Amino acid sequence: MKIMQLVAAAMAVSLLSVGPARAQFVVSDPATEAETLATALETAANLEQTITMVAMLTSAYGVTGLLTSLNQKNQYPSTRDLDTEMFSPRMPMSTTARAITTDTDRAVVGGDAEADLLRSQITGSANSAGIAADNLETMDKRLTANAETSTQLSRSRNIMQATVTNGLLLKQIHDAMIQNVQATSLLTMTTAQAGLHEAEEAAAQRKEHQKTAVIFGAVP
């Protein structure tokens, strides 16, 4: 029914574009009419295929819920934000990080240099833990989406739907590989962060020793 309606529309447009007749009788050319009809049928078929593809991508029976979660948020800080989030942090950057820093067992009292250093170290570690926690949550969602995609692929009704669904599945696998590399990089950065904390504590102790030495007149 859809094809016949599309053919009728295409034929109407074709007839309107011919222009006014110059004679009082209709001149019929079977070859031209057959070619026009074939073109109209091909145009209608292509249009219906396009409509079907669009409907498949947006309807429930196509790729349910996959397009909305296809491009998931990147949980990792950009290169320019590494210092402010992990190594010289000013504030917690996620809900998990805020929960860690506000725990009463980690409360630091005082406004001296050592207290400021401890607060910065706690915030940096909390931000790292928050990034890892958000990544785990994203991976859980991706695993669920992959399972749904596999199920959708097995229920595909035609080759077009199967091709689109398979493409989405491949993209999710590719994204998971990228996240795995990012997780490895995060592990490397948190190891460096722990080493930096030790160096910062040693530097703070050295400053205190130097201040004490100045008081007693024994500057190294």
UniProtKB/Swiss-Prot annotation:
Taxonomy, superkingdom: Bacteria
Bilayer-crossing regions: none
KW Amino-acid biosynthesis (keyword) present: no
Span of the signal peptide: 1-23
Keyword vocabulary terms for this entry: Crown gall tumor, Plasmid, Signal
GO biological-process terms attached to the record: protein secretion by the type IV secretion system
Residue stretches in coiled coil: none
GO cellular component, one term: type IV secretion system complex
Keyword Signal part of the UniProt annotation: yes
Family assignment from sequence similarity: Belongs to the virb5 family.
NCBIfam families in alphabetical order: PRK13860.1
Annotated function: VirB proteins are suggested to act at the bacterial surface and there play an important role in directing T-DNA transfer to plant cells.
Record protein name field: Protein virB5
